[in-house]
């Protein structure tokens, strides 16, 4: 199992993008932890967060399938682009990862952002 550093990643992101950071969630096979959530987006209830984490677990579980189908090497990050946020799911292994949500404009203003996040999180 890979060593993951979600708090280190959250600290890096707060320093790098400030208020553009919306949330950081760490998950493994059995549980999850909301590492950071910006105050103005802290309106998800427990059931909604459970649903999000269930989706993250499914995404992590599909990592090996995606790697086999595409044959590009290891899948390190999945990115979802929404109107108001861009979510990045840094996949450590089959059921472990860190999900980060940023304001869309914040994400678009960064360069080589995913590579930096992978390194800071210990996933590169």
Predicted regions and their residues:
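Non-catalytic interaction/Regulatory regions outside core domains
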Residues: 1-124
């Amino acid at each position: 199992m890979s060593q993951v550093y979600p708090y280190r990643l959250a600290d890096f992101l707060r320093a790098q993008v400030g208020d553009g950071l919306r949330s950081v969630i760490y998950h493994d096979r059995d549980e999850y932890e909301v590492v950071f959530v910006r105050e103005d987006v802290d309106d998800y209830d427990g059931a909604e967060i459970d649903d999000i984490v269930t989706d993250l677990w499914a995404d992590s579980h599909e990592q090996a399938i995606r790697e086999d189908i595409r044959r590009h090497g290891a899948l390190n990050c999945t990115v979802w682009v929404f109107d108001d946020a861009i979510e990045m799911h840094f996949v450590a292994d089959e059921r472990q990862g860190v999900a980060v949500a940023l304001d869309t404009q914040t994400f678009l203003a960064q360069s080589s952002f995913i590579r930096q996040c992978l390194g800071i999180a210990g996933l590169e």
